[in-house]
Amino acid sequence: MKKYKLSNQEVAQILEDFLEGRGSRWAWDDYTLGMSFEDKHLEDIRIRCVGLSKEFPPSNPNEYCNEQGRDVLRGYIKQLRASN
């Protein structure tokens, strides 16, 4: 799999777009399943995001994860935006 070199800000935007329901229809799948990052921290975040639906199962079948999982995403967004 190709290793991507995205910035912290770019990854934060992907997470925020997913959380807010913006972005393309397949952007989340592209991020979680179709990418791999050279930066270990960004790769660790991606891997954690892959498992959020199992770690924090949604009560609504139309959602990816529950509120606790969304809080994890918000935490990553805040962390990534703070670390230019």
Q: Model-predicted segments: where are they?
A:
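Acidic, Ser/Pro/Thr-rich low-complexity regulatory regions
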Residues: M1-N84
